Structures are given as C-alpha cells and as structure tokens.
C-alpha cells in the first residue's frame, strides 16, 4: 500500500433511537445517529405487520384468483 493516500479508519459509535450503541470502523470520523437497527427493526424482531389500506390485498387476490385456478 502506498503511504499517505489511504483514509484513516476510526472507531465511531452508532447510536440508535432504541438506545442500542454499536461501535464500528469508519472513514467518516464522526458518530452516527440511526433511526432503526437490528435490535429494533420490525423484520428482525418478528413484529412485522402488514398494513392493508382499503382492502387492497383482498381486491388483488380476488382479481387474480381466476388466474391462479388455471
């Protein structure tokens, strides 16, 4: 590696709104604020919900049920 051309890595803290603190290596050099992380994201915690506005999923299933039968 050539000296003097590579960015310096620093250990920074990524703070999540849930209170989780993650230490990572970064070239940014400043701390990060996260809205979601692996500890509070609905997909990873198993609390994922399907939001159906106006019965759109039911309408879709009715429309394409004919094609599924073929």
From Swiss-Prot:
CC per GO annotation: ribonucleoprotein complex; ribosome
Co-factor remark: Binds 1 zinc ion per subunit.
Q: Which residues bind Zn(2+)?
A: 16, 18, 37, 40
SUPFAM superfamilies xrefs: L28p-like
| GO terms for biological process, alphabetical | translation
PROSITE patterns, per database record? RIBOSOMAL_L31
Q: Which UniProt keywords apply?
A: Metal-binding, Ribonucleoprotein, Ribosomal protein, RNA-binding, rRNA-binding, Zinc
The record's listing under Pfam families reads: Ribosomal_L31
Q: Give cofactor(s), names only.
A: Zn(2+)
Respond yes or no to whether keyword Electron transport is given for this record: no
| Lineage top rank: taxon | Bacteria
Query: What Gene Ontology molecular-function terms does this entry list?
Result: metal ion binding; rRNA binding; structural constituent of ribosome
Keyword Ribonucleoprotein set for record: yes
HAMAP family in the record, alphabetically?
Ribosomal_bL31_1
Q: How does it assemble?
A: Part of the 50S ribosomal subunit.
What family does the Swiss-Prot or TrEMBL record give for this protein? Belongs to the bacterial ribosomal protein bL31 family. Type A subfamily.
User: PANTHER family of this UniProt entry?
Assistant: 50S RIBOSOMAL PROTEIN L31, CHLOROPLASTIC, LARGE RIBOSOMAL SUBUNIT PROTEIN BL31A
Protein role: Binds the 23S rRNA.
Q: What is this protein called?
A: Large ribosomal subunit protein bL31
Q: What is the lineage of its organism?
A: Bacteria, Pseudomonadati, Pseudomonadota, Gammaproteobacteria, Alteromonadales
